[in-house]
Amino acid sequence: MGKIYNDILETIGGTPLVRLNRLDKDLPGNVLVKLEFFNPANSVKDRIGKAIVDAAEASGELKPGGTIVEATSGNTGIALALVGAARGYNVVLTMPETMSLERRVLLRAYGAEIVLTPGSAGMQGAVDKANEIVTERGNAILARQFANAANPEVHRKTTGEEIWADTDGNVDIFVAGIGTGGTVTGAGETLKKHNPDVKVYAVEPEASLRDRKSVV
């Protein structure tokens, strides 16, 4: 009999590596991509959504029937909503009113409560509102994806180790987009632990407020 998972969260991680044959046919090496959209909510953020909740449960900060709060307009919100639905937590997500209707519909489908903030206040307005909600509600935690140590740690333990194992340690360069920095930092540190000569590159939009060539 094949493996039967106890819940949807057990399917997070273990995503495949696929060779880009057309892209690398004229290159001296192989270009591989890790298909994080194979995660149940279709993004790499599923890893940190579960990891953040796991850590909060383990520390006793998040108790049964509690509420998870975060300011997010992206995939982290979807991941937290998924985990909340699977574990029985309330999820409250704050975001500027300028965010797409499609994103709001998806989040509500997972059972999340959406609190919209003035678009003129940007993401800072959403962050301020999230802090306010956590203060007002009992048994509530702030996910803090940008500052939560569980974010890079889950990539050290899973993403980086998966890449190393699936390539039999044949990794020269690791490239990742940078949002919170958790993926490139955590996975990059693991790869460099196995082989200090691995080069790690973080990629972000040119217009980003951050300007850095390396984080590892």
Model-identified regions with their sequence ranges:
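PLP-dependent amino-acid enzyme catalytic core
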Residues: 1-216
